Amino acid sequence: WYSSMFAANIKQEPISHHHHHHHAHHSRRQHPHDSNSNSNASSPHQSPLPSPNPPSNTNLQLEQYLKHQQQQQQQQHQQQPMDTLCAAAMTPSPSNNDQNSPLTWPGLPNPMQSIMPANLRPSPNTTTTTPPAAAPAAATIALQANDKLQALTPPMDVTPPKSPAKSQQSCAEPEKEHDLMSNSSEDMKYMA
């Protein structure tokens, strides 16, 4: 969610390189909506905790941080290649936070940690419980599907023997094949 906001910032910033300050203000005015939509869109990932509500509160804090950070980042943006910033912003890593200045450490991780660990605690529990349950289920389903496929494939394997049988019949009756071939070739000649 934080990284998605920064990704949105980064996507907008290359456009705003020449009009950094004007564009940045516009983008910041739009950002509560963008970040809210991002947080709501990504809240399923973060589990529907009161994550939509904290973002609305933290967005104000975040905007203040972002205003400081963006001013710093705008300088960094012009210095650093975009890829490194994208990678740094996509992964809110300690190095990224260090780059963004210590403002993020006291500031962002508090809303982030208040939201994330609460989300991460249920989600690992649910994920760890469900994927093992889901994975064996998926595995068994896949195995069943494979069994069904294998059960279906023997008919498929049985039909090729039929086609050799047909080929044997055609070999036994080569004239029909030649007639078919000649007819088709003649039709092709006529068609041509």
Curated annotation (Swiss-Prot):
Residues 16-59, 88-108, 151-192 are annotated as: Disordered. The lineage of its organism: Eukaryota, Metazoa, Ecdysozoa, Arthropoda, Hexapoda. GO terms for cellular component: nucleus. The keyword Coiled coil does not apply. GO terms for biological process: segmentation. Residues 92-103 have a biased composition (Polar residues). The gene is hb. The keyword Protein biosynthesis does not apply. This is Protein hunchback. Residues 17-31 have a biased composition (Basic residues). Residues 173-192 have a biased composition (Basic and acidic residues). Keywords: Developmental protein, DNA-binding, Gap protein, Metal-binding, Nucleus, Repeat, Zinc, Zinc-finger. Signal peptide: none annotated. GO terms for molecular function: DNA binding; zinc ion binding.
